[in-house]
């Protein structure tokens, strides 16, 4: 597997991964080209989020709704790529980039972990567009995400794409839309059998984890997320190979 993915596999182990780029409250906003440029300049790898627009483009943005980062009402999926590309982020001159724009900026300077943001049950269109973009980019990348069926889509259609399954304790209110049995299965990593990932990206709230330790012992890298202070990383680093971070300099 190491030889299959080359430099991308090596970069799973470092450098650390800047969560939504290297953004700051009074600097470049999250998931912006400025934040990605800052991460590259500092020598970090990058995690970013992608969603599908009304006209089928993969845009880099985290929330389903636009208001927190733009002041614009409504859902990203109701807007076109052209309109979103003119929408300013957090009152700055930065606008919402496409995935293609982000990857062009980064090039080979960093590994980019692309989190697929889709509602459960809507697998296919975003994955397909992400793969189309990846065809034109030869820098190190992976796709990550919580939906095991998104991963199984890539495993079936494009097995050469490096895949990382996200999971966590599924104990918070953000998991309330999932059935209790699914939350239990996912927290216990039983969905690994569906997703067939190459690595795991696990929330700090489920680490250390005996089952994850077993996967790691058998050669599957573990990335922890999201460390917001050094002590959080220090508490779990014996069970992980790398971290996604924000708010401090590792």
Give the location of each predicted region:
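Phosphate-group recognition and catalysis centered on beta-loop-alpha active-site segments
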Residues: 1-250
């Amino acid at each position: 597997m190491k030889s299959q993915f080359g430099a991308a596999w090596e970069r799973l182990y470092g450098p650390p991964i800047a969560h939504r780029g290297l953004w700051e409250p009074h600097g470049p906003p999250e998931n912006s080209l400025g934040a990605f440029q800052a991460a590259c300049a500092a020598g970090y790898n990058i995690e970013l989020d992608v969603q599908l627009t009304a006209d089928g483009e993969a845009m880099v943005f985290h929330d389903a709704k636009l208001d927190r980062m733009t002041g614009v009402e409504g859902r990203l999926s109701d807007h076109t790529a052209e309109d979103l590309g003119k929408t300013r982020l957090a009152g700055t001159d930065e606008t919402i980039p496409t995935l293609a724009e982000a990857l062009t900026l980064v090039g080979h300077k960093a590994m980019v972990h692309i989190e697929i943001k889709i509602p459960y049950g809507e697998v296919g269109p975003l994955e397909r567009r992400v793969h189309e973009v990846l065809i034109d980019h030869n820098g190190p990348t992976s796709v990550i995400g919580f939906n095991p069926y998104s991963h199984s889509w890539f495993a079936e259609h494009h097995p050469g794409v490096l895949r990382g399954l996200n999971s966590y304790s599924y104990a918070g209110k953000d998991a309330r839309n999932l059935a209790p049995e699914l939350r239990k299965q996912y927290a216990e990593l039983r969905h690994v059998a569906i997703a067939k990932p190459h690595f795991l990206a696990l929330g700090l709230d489920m680490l250390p984890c005996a089952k994850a330790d077993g996967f790691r012992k058998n050669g599957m890298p573990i990335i922890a997320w999201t460390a917001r202070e050094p002590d959080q990383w220090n508490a779990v680093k014996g069970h992980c190979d790398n971290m996604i971070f924000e708010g401090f300099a590792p």
